[in-house]
């Protein structure tokens, strides 16, 4: 074999070797990715079942609390405690229940028309119970009409506007955002005085229906990122259009919401002190709360429409860690005669917890 032929043969061998190495590397990479995908799928499936187990446990706790205290819901009951568990296989479970009525339900800003009012919390209580609580649970009684219109402003919308003002927003801008949000929720395409319908949005239309997630608030005309973040701890979305806020589960950090419920007639410091002075098992009825000397008479009529001492809507934030994988789930419970899970959300869904 000539020298030239030996060189060609060596070149062919090197080419074949490089091709074999490339193929082997590709097979190894694909096998590794397939193994990783399988591992992730198994971890996710395992985490999901753990989350459903945590959800069932929270459901049982809510049911027991309702049986132990059928007329009131307050901080200090078992449902309000964070549960942190380490399983035998190394899985870490963290679950926390949150009162869905310790926040302002955005869907209450545009209640359905010509509908007989019901208790917003979903309670099937009698008139006597409502009288004892001092509230019918309906947060949308007619209010004085807005200037220049015949539209009656729901009390929840007034609270939302006042909440933005308490958080430092300009009153005129707060009015515009409130009307824009009401237009987002209502079924028609007629804008309110300061509202926004189809013509105000580019490339998409307002929902014209109830919100299903609080993140929709970011898309409302006039809502910027800074205000959105400030509002997040105090607002939520429930699948009802009534407002009922439980004074027994408001934390001192919710002072801006309490101040807004009284239209700013109580300062943030005073609202925080009121919540700090709450009895260990909450106020026995709404009249005990309303009888506090620190509360201004001017705001009691409005606040009485929406304040309650019993909750029937709860969120559960569940975090599962399996090996290096993390799984997040938020469940929404409705507590009536039975505990029902009405919604589940997966993954990171917001930047601030309520």
Swiss-Prot record:
GO biological process terms, semicolon-separated:
protein secretion
In residue numbers, the region (Disordered) covers 114-151
Compositional bias, Low complexity, is annotated for 118-141
Under Gene3D superfamilies, the record lists:
EpsJ-like (1.10.40.60), GSPII I/J protein-like (3.30.1300.30)
Question: Which chain regions cross the lipid bilayer?
Answer: 8-28
Could you tell me which Pfam families the record lists for this protein?
T2SSK, T2SSK_1st
Protein location:
Cell inner membrane
Q: Which residues lie on this side of the membrane: Periplasmic?
A: 29-354
Which residues form the propeptide in this entry?
A: 1-7
Q: Which UniProt keywords apply?
A: Cell inner membrane, Cell membrane, Membrane, Protein transport, Transmembrane, Transmembrane helix, Transport
Q: How is it modified after translation?
A: Cleaved by prepilin peptidase.
InterPro entries attached to this UniProt entry: GspK, GspK_central_sf, Pilin-like, T2SSK_SAM-like_1st, T2SSK_SAM-like_2nd
- Cell inner membrane among the record's keywords? yes
Under the cellular component aspect of Gene Ontology, which terms does the record hold?
plasma membrane
Q: Does the keyword Transmembrane apply?
A: yes
User: How does this polypeptide assemble, per the annotation?
Assistant: Type II secretion is composed of four main components: the outer membrane complex, the inner membrane complex, the cytoplasmic secretion ATPase and the periplasm-spanning pseudopilus. Interacts with core component OutG.
Q: What does this protein do?
A: Component of the type II secretion system required for the energy-dependent secretion of extracellular factors such as proteases and toxins from the periplasm. Plays a role in pseudopilus assembly and seems to control its length. Interacts with the pseudopilus tip complex that is critical for the recognition and binding of secretion substrates.
Q: Which family does it belong to?
A: Belongs to the GSP K family.
Instruction: Name the PANTHER family for this protein.
Output: TYPE II SECRETION SYSTEM PROTEIN K, TYPE II SECRETION SYSTEM PROTEIN K-RELATED
Which NCBIfam families does the entry mention? T2SS_GspK (NF037980)
Q: What is this protein called?
A: Type II secretion system protein K
- Organism, per UniProt? Dickeya chrysanthemi (Pectobacterium chrysanthemi)
This chain is encoded by the gene named: outK
